[in-house]
Amino acid sequence: MAKDHYFDISAKLDMMEMKNAIEQAKKEVSTRFDFKGIMVEIDLNEKAKVLNLSSSSDSKIDALKDIVMSKMIKRGLSTKSLDEVKTEGISGGNVKVVYRIVDSIEKDEAKKIVKAIKDAKLKVTPSIQGDEIRVTGKKIDDLQAVIALVKQMEDLKAPLTFGNFK
């Protein structure tokens, strides 16, 4: 009798790596010449899963965003983990950008992934389990085909990870 194999699709984010990326970004900002004498703030709230970037102008916010994104990429984190919620002007002409940290697959996105897997007509069974999708099948080749299929889906907002292969 053939044994079923499975894997999980999730959108987990390593918060320790995120903290390290933010610390590296703060260190780079403190040494950069174009940020000397300018109010710059990078604040990571782990409990609320929010990242706040504040600076004196839009151009400085863009540079700050690029620094944070590059540090995330160097630490192996997906930039899809940050979802821009709002940009607002704060006192003194300063600008603040608020990012929500995405670390789970939303229900509608999970349904879209499951539908794409079912439409592929592979001999696998996807099921939504909380904030994960478990894909079960008899052949490992079918599971690898599902991974390739999901990686090709470009319209997904969550940074997907594949794990728990059994």
UniProtKB/Swiss-Prot annotation:
GO cellular component, one term: cytosol
Source species, domain of life: Bacteria
Family per similarity comment: Belongs to the YajQ family.
Organism of this sequence: Sulfurovum sp. (strain NBC37-1)
The protein's name in its UniProt record: Nucleotide-binding protein SUN_0226
GO molecular function: nucleotide binding
Function comment: Nucleotide-binding protein.
Annotated NCBIfam families: PRK05412.1
Pfam families: DUF520
Entries under CDD domains matching the protein: YajQ_like (cd11740)
Keywords annotated in UniProt: Nucleotide-binding
SUPFAM superfamilies listed in its UniProt record: YajQ-like
